[in-house]
Amino acid sequence: MSDLKTESQDLQQEENALIALRKEKLAAERAKGNAFPNDFRRDSYCNDLQKQYADKTKEELEAAAIPVKVAGRIMLNRGSFMVIQDMTGRIQVYVNRKTLPEETLAAVKTWDLGDIISAEGTLARSGKGDLYVEMTNVRLLTKSLRPLPDKHHGLTDTEQRYRQRYVDLMVNEETRHTFRVRSQVISHIRKFLIERDFLEVETPMLQTIPGGAAAKPFETHHNALDMAMFLRIAPELYLKRLVVGGFEKVFEINRNFRNEGVSTRHNPEFTMLEFYQAYADYRDNMDLTEELFRELAQLVLGSTDVPYGDKVFHFGEPFVRLSVFDSILKYNPELTAADLQDVDRARDIAKKAGAKVLGHEGLGKLQVMIFEELVEHKLEQPHFITEYPFEVSPLARRNDDNPAVTDRFELFIGGREIANAYSELNDAEDQAERFLAQVAEKDAGDDEAMHYDADFVRALEYGMPPTAGEGIGIDRLVMLLTNSPSIRDVILFPHMRPQA
C-alpha cells in the first residue's frame, strides 16, 4: 500500500512540475499581449478534409494549391509536424521552415500537447499518403496548463473518466463515438415521431405531486410559494392531460429523477422518451416500437443484428410476445399454474427467489415479484412481456377478457427493461379507486407507491379518448447500440460521490 502511495505522490509531483512549466509559458504569452486571441475563423473541419480529398493524389493537390483554415488541439508534436484534433477528427499540419518566420518556428517548439492552435495553409499529401496542411501561418489560441494523459496508457481509470469526462472526450475516440451515437439516436427518434404526426411538448420538471411511475422522488422546497415540490419521476400524467385537451399525439424527450440506487443500469437522473397516441392500443405501440428499434439499429450499425458483449440481439426478427404468467412457467418449468394462482404458495416462491416480501402483497404483485427474480435476467433476445396484473399497473387499462390483468407490456432486451407501455386507463372512477389503493400501499410502507392526484382524475372526468402510451429509456437503448456495459458510459456527467 505504501508503494502505491509513494508512486501516486511521485506522479503528482511530476504533474505539478509540468503545470508550473506551462504556467511560465503562459506568462510569457501574456507578456507579448493577448494570450487568448479570439479573432480566428476556420473554414474547414479536419475529418471533412480527409473525406473530401481522399481520392486526390499528391500531384493533384500540389497543382490545385487548395487554401484551408483549420484549428484544433495538439495531440502530437514532432517538431517538423503536428497532429491536431477538432470535433470531427484529426489532420497533420506541417511546420515548413521555408514559409514560417523564425519567431513562429521558435514559438512552435515551446507548444505542448493539449494546446489549441489555428493553422492556415494549403493541402498536400505526404510520401506515405497522409493528407496534411502545409502551413503558411500558425498561432497559439489557448495554452493548456494541464498535461494530457500519457499517450501509451491513456485515460484508463474508469472513475476518472466519469469525473473528468472532458479529458475522456479529448483522448478516447470510443467515448466520442458513443456520444455522437447518442445524439444521432435522439435526433432520429424525434424525426421518426414527428413524421408520424406526433407533437413534441415540454411538461413540468418541478411537480407538486410526483406521479406517472412507481418510484421514490427527490423532494425540494419552493421558497416563494413556501411549499414542498418534487423533481418529476415521469411526465406521464401531464402528457395525458394534453391528450384530454386535444393534442392527440404527443411526445417528450427529457430527464426524469428517481431517488433510488445507483448501478450499471440505474442513474438517479436519466433520459426518457414518452409518447402517447389517441385511438390506439398497446399492440399498436408494440408494432411502432419494433419499427423504431429496427430503424435505429440500421442507422447506427448498418444492420439489425446488435452485438452486445458476447451476445448478438436480433432486431430484424419479430420480437417475442409473452405474458407475465406464461413467461414464469416457460422459464421455470418446475413451477405450475396452480403455484402462481395460490397467494400463499406464490408468497413462498417469491421469498425463496429473494424478493423483498412485506406480507400485504396481493397475488398479482407476488407474480410480478417472481417474474422479476426468476425471469427478467433470462430475457436475452427482445421480449414484449404483456398482461401485467392491475395491482402493479395503476395507470393502465384493464384487459377486456381478464380484468385481473392490464393491456400493458414491458420490453426486455439483454435481461434489462428498455420500455414500458400500455393502453391507458381512461375511466376516471376506476383511476380514482386505483389511486386510493396506491395510497393504502404507501401507508403500508411502500415508498414507491403513487400519490393521489385529484387534478388528473378531474382531467379524466372531462373524457380522454382511447389512448396508448409508452416510455423508452434512452440511456439503456444507447447502451445496447454502443455495446456499453454501464449506464455511466452513455451519460456525459453521471452522478458520483464527491472526491475525498
UniProtKB/Swiss-Prot annotation:
Entry binding sites for Mg(2+) 1: 410, 417
Major enzyme class: ligase
Record bears the keyword Magnesium: yes
Entry note: cofactor: Binds 3 Mg(2+) ions per subunit.
Pfam name, any one: tRNA_anti-codon
Listed GO MF terms: ATP binding; lysine-tRNA ligase activity; magnesium ion binding; tRNA binding
EC number of the protein: 6.1.1.6
PROSITE patterns registered for this protein in UniProt: AA_TRNA_LIGASE_II
Keywords: Aminoacyl-tRNA synthetase, ATP-binding, Cytoplasm, Ligase, Magnesium, Metal-binding, Nucleotide-binding, Protein biosynthesis
Cofactors required: Mg(2+)
Any one GO BP annotation for this protein: lysyl-tRNA aminoacylation
SS bond list: none
Reactions it catalyzes: tRNA(Lys) + L-lysine + ATP = L-lysyl-tRNA(Lys) + AMP + diphosphate
GO CC, any one term: cytosol
UniProt-listed HAMAP family: Lys_tRNA_synth_class2 (MF_00252)
The family this protein is said to belong to: Belongs to the class-II aminoacyl-tRNA synthetase family.
The protein's assembly and partners: Homodimer.
Name of the molecule in the record: Lysine--tRNA ligase
